[in-house]
Amino acid sequence: MTLRRAARSLFGWKALRPNQLAAMRAVMKRRDALVVLPTGAGKSAIYQIPASLIPGPTVVISPLLALQQDQIASLNERQRPELRAVRISSNESPTQQAEAITEIREGRAEFLFITPEQLSNPDRMAEVAALKPALVAIDEAHCISAWGHDFRPDYLALGHLIDGIGRPPVVALTATASPPVRDDIIARLRLRDPEVVVSGLDRPNLFVEVAQCATEDYRWRRLIALLSDDERPGIIYVPTRRAAEELATRLTDAGYPAQFYHGGMATGARHELHEAFLADQVPIMVATSAFGMGIDKPNIAWVVHMALPDSPDSYFQEIGRAGRDGQPARVLLLWQAEDVGLQRFFSGGLPDVDELRDLAALLRKKPATKTELRETTGLGPRKLGQYLSLLEQVGAAEPRARQRIGAPRYSPTPTDAAAAALAEAERQQTVTRSRTDMMRAFAETTACRGQTLLAYFGEQMTQVCGHCDNCHNGTSVADQGAVGPFPVHSQVRHPEWGPGMVLSYEEDKMTVLFEEVGYKTLSVRVVSEQGLLTLD
């Protein structure tokens, strides 16, 4: 059966997009692949359709249980054994987990959904390896990159874990990954000569609008104007949990029934709200960034941000939830200059070097579980996870058997490890803050917003997008494929900031992402006249 025929007979799809086909063919040839496609462009199909044709089960690694549940339900409602999916997670009992393994082993199910945490258990890894998986699909692959906006330390071990189950071909999927994040994904997952498919990040059905608000009252009136004009459902993103609760109450009192959602709510309550929103029972959801992954809802008519997001990465991911049905949708950013200070506050403080040193010393003594380390150090789960991630990145920690963590054989001394981890944390904070600066530049630009946003992700648009407020107001100017002294995506070096990658040109400016200091916008004229950059 061909890919197109499988898509038609198993999923009822009449056609596949060219970028989907390119990625699927790589999977069919048993090649590793990295796929960057916009939200709603059918990324899941890229592993699901080939998996139905390739002998052997497929392991799907995904960060959120809600995201897994939606994909499992979508596969199982088709009632075909070659599409049946099972799951191993903290939500399943030991009996259910054993039954899932049995179903895969006996050929009654094709897809095994699992989290990195479950796969890191050596006994579980051995069970999965014995199934001889034919393919590994990694959803939300940008979570593995410390360059990314949604970094998850438990993803760091995936390269090691995939080796542990026999290193089958890997397809890594994400909706948002700038060039350095793509490079990081390839390196950390140890992808071998992967097929890289990056396509179609422009969303022509989204009208992108930004308004700088002089007062809170103006911000409120702009929101109400949109709610009065537009149909439901929609999502309003706010920066804090308190803001979510207060705005939902204020909207409801004003005659616009709304619910709030944030990470501080009980798991059960969040799940109920998630399901209610998908079922069109919640017309307006006011949420923090905790509401996002797993929201596969095609008819979201608008997305509003009530403050400046922390980065173009987050913004792009969140606005991508609108208009997945292809119908016109609005995305509106209402921001104030004070939002930048708030995001700098959220980027947090730096780790304590003494705590890092003590933790590194413990790991050198003997491997321990996270529970044991929490009891010994007194560190909370979040801080411990951050510290272990930093120590792993500087070669002072590594996963061991029985869910333990230890120090590599030739790890640095605790003092050196702590200093290196602190330096890495400082670098990450600098990069994070530079992303906020890029977000502000996007909000303030009078140029085409589509060009500006895609340039951040390393995509050059030679024509204006035609679907943003600046294009509508006539301030956008086509850059005619602006070029400069260095090719886009070339590696360059600055005498002070070190190595970097050229991302884009816009009029007389160029954007470069430096490893040490993050995103910088430079004058092309000054770079050329003063020889500030050299090819690396």
Residues covered by each model-derived region:
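Helicase motor core with emphasis on the C-terminal RecA-like subdomain
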Residues: 1-10, 14-18, 22-44, 51-56, ...
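Residue-level detector of conserved, well-ordered beta-strand and adjacent loop positions
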Residues: 89, 262, 374, 493, ...
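A generic structural motif
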Residues: 30-32, 56, 290, 497-499, ...
